[in-house]
């Protein structure tokens, strides 16, 4: 694999990926040189862009892998992944290898997967010791509305700025979010394909 393209639903996911991907990818992968994060303005914008982007990437003179990342929100995770995979397959004329990864419920599930990162960013508002034995941190993907849950604990926060700060603190090898780990595994399998 010579190049990776990450098509993401929204700017906050893009900001997190810009920080954590260098922690996940093997040495030699450099943002905006051989891996790119392409944010969209929501689910419909992402879906509309998939056919165009797959066509453009298939014409590149590089072996390009594509990873599509979207929040689950209230959707059925398997059905959503299947719908996005079908759209990618229909749009994939060359074809380019791809993976579809669904963030279980919302991006904040990934934050709760590494509660120490939240505590570092909000040291006076979030204490790991208070939450470590609760599903909030043990099973972060089971939180239906993690964004609201985080707001109840720490109050209102600037979404993109907070995404960057938490991502800097995240330990990508200790995250308990299953969807985060599926995301990581998808990258690894794509690079090795």
Model segments located where?
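C-terminal accessory helical subdomains adjacent to catalytic cores in phosphodiester-
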Residues: 1-4, 14-40, 47-65, 69-193
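Helix N-cap/beta->alpha junction signal
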Residues: 9-10
